[in-house]
Amino acid sequence: MAQWNYGDILDAVDAIVPGDRVALIHGERAIRWRDFTRRTNNLARALLDGGATPGDKIAFFMRNRSEYSEGIAAGFKARLTHVNVNYRYVDHELVYLLDNADAAVVVYAAEFAPMVAAIRERLPNVAQWVEVADGHRGGDDVIAYESLAERGSGAPLGIGRSGDDMLFLYTGGTTGMPKGVMWRHDDLWRGTGAGGNPRIGVPPSPDLSAYVERLKVEPPPVNLPLPPMMHGTGLLGAVAAMTHGGTCVTLKARSFDPDEALAAIERHRVTAATIVGDAFARPLVEALDRANPKPDIASLRVISSSGVMWTREIKAGLLRHNSELTLIDGFASSEALGLGSSVMTRDKAVDVAKFTLGPTCKVFTEDRREVKAGSGESGMVAVCGPLPVGYYKDAAKTAKTFPVIDGVRYSIPGDWVRVEADGTLTLLGRGSNCINTAGEKVYPEEVEEALKAHVAVADALVVGVADAKWGQSITAVVQLEPRAEFDEQEMKDFVKTRIAAYKVPKRILPVADLKRAPNGKADYKHVREYAEATLRGQSGA
């Protein structure tokens, strides 16, 4: 069976796409395919000439922009292993991730030059620091991205590649520190549909030549990944545009702006958008509802989401403004693709948190018994087929998440479900206390540790409270030291100096006693109920 490699796919796409087709759009700047091909080939060759070797890790530390897409493509072509970096991290989090990943190359935006300057000496194994100019004052003793992309003939590298080449997706770990999920190119391509999309009836391609022939006759997509490309959902949305010979549109705003998104859809005739549930969809619906005149979003045919709840009411709101939309709600994670899906159109409504079980999925109890449809039992959903190799440098976590059951290797990321009589899944949530806020994984232990470093805090517990916008809102309940004064905003500001801003609790609630069990264990259920009741009372609900 032929092995797939993203660098080979891009070389093949480069060879057939009309050179004047637009490949990347960011603000007013458009890069056409002939220039995308030339620049990514130049960049790939320059990184290898600079000392990188196949298998080395290349980390990307920037917001969504065209250079991010170019850098990903160049890394694929040079056989370098992609590493995503959360641009919200503070310095010790960055050092941990880049050191854990064994990053040899870091491509970063100039806005982050001060952070890079602060950590460089602690990362002696990074051989190339490549800076993308973005209007901010850059750093010293760095390599200019643009000089690498523009220097050279732009010819293909002409190197052999392998389906075993890797892509790392760093995701939250059980202690709050990120872990690198290792995907082989061949497995990731097959796991994402092998150039097709079975959820809307597009079959996979059997090999590269058949895939290329299909691209010659299919209309090219215009994709708009709205989540950060530093996460899997946004990243795969951008990669899909490039590997399909289409156009990837990215927005300039530092945070999600629904009006900018709608303007981009209208202006660039976007055909597919990627979101993360209600955190993106609700602002889009609200912007559409208030707009006068209404933006023209008739070109948009598919909106895909993964990672957080996407409610039926919000889906209906989108369909009210464009009845031709297909809304694909994917049940997946960095460790497990294709756990389930839910497709909604104007003719087919679906319930919230209900998914069709993927064809390679089963549901198991904690003692590894298979849960049968309609049994009323709950279990953890598992998927076989194309899977990650495991977690980088973490054999114990790999063995736990990717067990072999009855001779079959599965990925079981920890999502609890109930299998209904009709075979559909009702999503119950993570068995752990992981908080999912707008697609970001936040583990309570890390936030609790930051809170407990505050002089006024004797103890702290952190939970996720249901939130219409964020999916879950991070809420802390703190037990104060005797005679300590409570200042919620000051405490938030303190925590923000120790962990990334998105992990800082939206609310901090004081209590006299957290009532831990004698063995020190926390009653998270009680804390969550207390937080929900308190917040309801404060809102007057």
Named regions from a protein language model:
Residues D49-G50, L80-E150:
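Structural core segment of the AMP-binding/adenylate-forming
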Residues Y89, V95-Y96, V106-Y108, A332, ...:
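AMP-binding/adenylate-forming catalytic core of the ANL superfamily
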Residues G152-Y170, G176-M177, M182, E213-V222:
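Conserved pre-ATP/AMP-binding loop-to-beta segment of ANL
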Residues V132, T497-K521:
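AMP-binding/adenylate-forming catalytic domain of the ANL superfamily
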Residues R190-L226, M230-A272, A287:
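Conserved AMP-binding/adenylation subdomain of ANL enzymes
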Residues K362-C384, V419-D422, A484-E488, A522-D523:
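Conserved beta-loop-beta connector loops within the AMP-binding
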Residues A2, V22-R65, S69-A73, V90-V95:
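Conserved AMP-binding/adenylate-forming core of the ANL superfamily
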Residues G173, T243-H244, V270-I275, V285-D351, ...:
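Gly/Ser/Thr-rich phosphate-binding loop
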